[in-house]
Amino acid sequence: MANQELIDALRDAEAVKFGEFELSHGGTSEYYVDKYVFETDPGCLRQIADAFADRVGDAKLAGVALGAVPLVAATAVETDSPYVIVRKQKKEYGTGNQIEGDFDAGEEVVVLEDIATTGQSAIDAVEALREAGATVDRVIVVVDREEGARENLAEHDIELESLVTASDLLADR
């Protein structure tokens, strides 16, 4: 069932835009969900953190840098849980870490993400966490664009959950 309150908040914040947009995977779309709008709007961020908190259980939280960092931080505050940040690649300076924050080998981790289109950034984050010893089988996103992410993640034994889908956001528009 769609989270109508969150859908309304995303629409009211004007996070859903219409026009011609190039997406990060190279495709184009007639609509765009602007994560920076909903991640910087306190009302949207609060609703997202509350919704994530209802779903994460006791798992350690992980967010994909950069887009999911505000989401995982807000959810960590809501759940009083520590979290880790997964970079797209290892740093070439300082500690050289790809994963910032601590977790124990075998610990259950759930990845929080902003928007899923193909799911590749979530897959990359899960693979990095698994290589580091975490147990990861779930990714929760704010918006599933319904363009193959669920199927792509399933090929890697990862379940995709979404707070809302593109169909939810675009209904009645």
UniProtKB/Swiss-Prot annotation:
Its cofactor is Mg(2+). Pfam families: Pribosyltran (PF00156). Keywords: Glycosyltransferase, Magnesium, Pyrimidine biosynthesis, Transferase. Its EC number is 2.4.2.10. CDD domains: PRTases_typeI. Orotate binds at T117, R145. It catalyses: orotidine 5'-phosphate + diphosphate = orotate + 5-phospho-alpha-D-ribose 1-diphosphate. InterPro entries: OPRT, Or_phspho_trans_dom, PRibTrfase_dom, PRTase-like. 5-phospho-alpha-D-ribose 1-diphosphate binds at R87, K88, K91, E113, D114, I115, A116, T117, T118, G119, Q120, S121. GO terms for molecular function: magnesium ion binding; orotate phosphoribosyltransferase activity. Pathway: Pyrimidine metabolism; UMP biosynthesis via de novo pathway; UMP from orotate: step 1/2. GO terms for biological process: 'de novo' UMP biosynthetic process; pyrimidine nucleobase biosynthetic process. NCBIfam families: pyrE. Belongs to the purine/pyrimidine phosphoribosyltransferase family. PyrE subfamily. PANTHER family: OROTATE PHOSPHORIBOSYLTRANSFERASE, URIDINE 5'-MONOPHOSPHATE SYNTHASE. Homodimer. Catalyzes the transfer of a ribosyl phosphate group from 5-phosphoribose 1-diphosphate to orotate, leading to the formation of orotidine monophosphate (OMP). This is Orotate phosphoribosyltransferase. It comes from Natronomonas pharaonis (strain ATCC 35678 / DSM 2160 / CIP 103997 / JCM 8858 / NBRC 14720 / NCIMB 2260 / Gabara).
